[in-house]
Regions:
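N-terminal signal peptide c-region/cleavage motif recognized by signal peptidases
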Residues: 17-21
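Bacterial N-terminal signal peptides that target proteins for export
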Residues: 1-9
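Intrinsically disordered, low-complexity linkers and terminal tails enriched in Ser/Thr/Pro/Gly
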Residues: 9-12, 24-58, 62, 70-73, ...
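Sec/Tat-exported extracytoplasmic proteins
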Residues: 35-38, 51-53, 68, 132, ...
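A glycine-biased structural micro-motif
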Residues: 58-61, 90, 230
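Hydrophobic beta-strand residues in large extracellular and virion-surface proteins
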Residues: 64, 78, 93-95, 128, ...
């Protein structure tokens, strides 16, 4: 007869059951895309999650938290009380603030509305975490601000093999234009580190909800055609020259092919976007 105490056997079995259940609920998830503001309006924010495998749509046990540059003073961004209908690999979950929805074309239809905004003071440096409700597991972490972020970068190994999501993305969380900070890997990809895994979207950012609705965040300043950073400048000028003669390019403002009219329009709107 085994000498293993019954309580140990029961505990081990319970742990295995919980682990198996978690794999088919929500934890194999990326923080795919984040924007901290639109054209300087920091009340217009969005977070897009992406499922790494199927059966990750039972979100009722998950939360999104944001913390400041020291990894402290956490704010609840999203308390998920329900899941989303479709749990196929690669499907998204769109979480927005009310101020974000009218900035896209068509107006965004989110899966969830943010519980709280990411504070403006956290945009320079901070960390966003996708966790379980009990705060035991950090399933995904996105930190930004480079050396200005001094908090932890650790997380669960289910999405990052070494459990270390750092170093952080070197810049701030974007808020000046229409660019978002976006994970560059495939839907199935695990994290390597935030600095290498993330990049700003090129130009306008695209947002997708669980039902595959697509919402384009367009710039009200079309002359900011090179980097969508909220200012018409040298990068936009070089982008225009690089697509000279191209019809339908990002700097073809009149639709007749990038040329002298577009060049003059860009120069006439040089500087910060309105």
């Amino acid at each position: 007869m085994s000498n293993t105490p019954r309580t140990v056997v029961v505990a081990a079995g319970l742990a295995a059951a919980l682990s198996t259940g978690a794999e088919a609920t929500f934890h194999l998830m990326q923080i795919e895309q984040v924007i901290g503001g639109v054209n300087g309006d920091v009340t217009a924010q969005a977070v897009q999650l992406r499922m790494r495998t199927g059966l990750q749509n039972l979100l009722g046990g998950a939360r999104l938290w944001v913390r400041d540059a020291t990894g402290s003073n956490r704010i609840l961004v999203m308390n998920f009380t329900a899941g989303v209908p479709v749990g196929l690999a690669g499907r998204r979950v769109l979480i927005t603030s009310p101020g974000f929805n009218s900035t896209t074309s068509p107006s965004a239809v989110p899966d969830f509305t943010m519980t709280n905004l990411i504070p403006a003071s956290y945009l320079a440096a901070g960390t966003l975490t996708f966790e379980d409700n009990l705060g035991i597991f950090v399933y995904w972490r996105l930190s930004w601000g480079g050396a200005a972020y001094t908090g932890p970068n650790d997380g669960d190994i289910c999405n990052d093999p070494d459990g270390e999501f750092g170093p952080p993305w070197p810049g701030p969380l974007p808020s000046a234009g229409v660019q978002a900070l976006q994970f560059q890997g495939t839907a199935a990809a695990a994290s390597s580190n935030n600095a290498d895994d993330y990049a700003l979207t090129s130009g306008s950012s695209e947002w997708v909800n669980n039902a595959l609705g697509v919402f384009l965040l367009e710039s009200p300043c079309p002359w900011d055609c090179g980097d969508s950073d909220g200012e018409v400048g040298i990068v936009d000028f070089l982008a225009l020259l690089g697509e000279w003669g191209v019809v339908g390019g990002s700097c073809d403002f009149d639709g007749g092919g990038t040329g002298i009219t577009d060049f003059l329009a860009l120069l006439g709107n040089w500087g910060p976007c309105p």
